């Protein structure tokens, strides 16, 4: 099982990625062992998490979300945090 996730820090920086273990991945981001983008940029928290059935599906969704403008990403985060299914809009 794979997850597409978004993390955000206190400076409102958003990062999109995929992982099999969201808790461990967040630890790596916050301990400066994660992606270059997140190193030394304050503590991140998970603001979006979406389960995918396979690595291929997760990668496809990650790429899709990364192409979106910030406002669309924030809308997705808002839906997730309201408990609304985020799998309703998979169009680019």
Language-model regions: role of each:
Residues 1-35, 39-71, 76-92:
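GIY-YIG nuclease catalytic motif and its immediate N-terminal context
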